[in-house]
Amino acid sequence: MKYLLSLIIGFISLSLSANEISFNNEKVNYKVMYKWGLVNKQAGTATLTITNKGDNYITKLTARSDPWADKFYTVRDTLNGIIKKAGFLPMFYEKKAHEGGEFKHDIVKYSRSGNKVLGYCTRIKRDEDEAKGTKKEHIISTTGTTVDMLSVYYYMRALNYDEMKKNQVMKLTIFSGKRKELLTIKYHGTENVAYDNKSYNCYHISFTFTSDGGKKTSDDMDAWITTDSKRIPVKLEGVLPVGKVQCFCTGYN
């Protein structure tokens, strides 16, 4: 669930470019639905914004669970990021999270030299009953295309899906405040998505997260991105131990 919320609340290939489209100032709202059998109830909301500022994009995600869902699992997340427009390179990532009874504050600052990428990571973590948490700092290193749980939302929108073949697979590294993971993205072609009396023609992609050892770190996720010039992810879906979470776009401006 945490990966899905981070993408809402979320490709190494020389033939693909993350500069196919540029982003104007925008705001996208989502509703987060919990589905299990006949149960289909809104569990939360999320809002993503991106602002042009000189050579950079300033990004932000806020997400919160609805009051009834707070009784089972509270979510109050804020993610902030800075992306360099040239090359679409993440420069800074921050996540302030209250999930369940746990509080986390992650910061990643990027450094690049040629194809090498370093992430200077700080994590502060505490439980609800702790007055002061623990702080850990470490450095993550990798090579090639690298994103985080916020910048990947915009990176996947900027790819040229029209040049991809069905079932084509792309790989890249994704940083969190704790570790790096391999993100595998598979393109499934175009599909129609309908909800709230509207329908959208979309590119369908799926995500798989694995550790350095190749072990899956979460269940697969799916996203549907409109084929028009706005490239809005109108639907995201992830499987939970019981039921699944679906996120639907409810507004764009």
What are these regions (language model features)?
Residues M1-L4:
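Positively charged n-region of N-terminal signal peptides that target proteins for export
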Residues I8-S17:
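Hydrophobic h-region of N-terminal signal peptides that target proteins for export
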Residues I9, I21, A86, T145-V147, ...:
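Short non-domain terminal segments
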Residues N19-R112, A158-N253:
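Acidic, serine/threonine-rich low-complexity disordered tracts
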Residues G114-S176:
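Active-site/ligand-binding surface loops and adjacent short beta/alpha elements
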